[in-house]
Design a protein with these regions (language model features):
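Sec-dependent signal peptide recognition
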Residues: 1-7
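Phosphate/nucleotide-binding beta-alpha loop and adjacent structural elements of enzyme active sites
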Residues: 10
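Sec/Tat signal peptide C-region and signal peptidase I cleavage site
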Residues: 13-17
Length: 149
């Protein structure tokens, strides 16, 4: 009985720890013609009122050794809580897209690396808070170092 109570307690704790976050996908997943040319699409998860969530995105890059920052427009799709990010940063250099979201009193963040063939899902990082500048720097450094190997 004690094991059962402990298991239920652990499940409840992990369920409460799972808060507002993002899920990223290919632009064809949008199933809306105007968004199929986007760099990627994403949706909010575990947001009670997704239409009221506030989302911002910035492309952070290193081009010819210099740091660049490009504010991005986040385009809402017809389904509440689903958004597209179009590539408005240059083709040169290495880039990550930094997402920040607020849903009621919860925040979420993500760092989405962009490679020559598009976003790199397996290297993307998700946070229960906005990504820290040091985390963005580390992601960019990893991408640049990967080029030199």
């Amino acid at each position: 009985m004690l094991r059962f109570a402990l298991a239920i307690s652990l499940l409840a704790t992990s369920a409460m720890a799972d808060g507002f976050t993002f899920t990223i996908g290919n632009s064809v997943a949008a199933q809306e013609a105007p968004f199929k040319s986007a760099a990627f699409v994403f949706r909010t998860e575990r947001c009670a009122e997704p239409a009221k969530s506030q989302i911002t995105a910035t492309a952070e890059g290193i081009v010819h050794g210099a740091r660049r920052s490009v504010p991005l427009k986040v385009s809402a799709l017809q389904r509440p809580g689903v958004y597209a990010v179009f590539q408005t940063w240059g083709n040169e250099g290495r880039w990550v897209v930094v997402l920040k979201g607020v849903c009621q009193n919860e925040t979420a963040g993500a760092i989405v690396p962009i490679g020559p063939k598009g976003f790199i899902r397996e290297s993307s990082k998700f946070f229960p808070r906005p990504a820290a500048g040091t985390e963005v720097d580390a992601s960019l450094k990893t991408m640049v170092e990967g080029d030199s190997k």
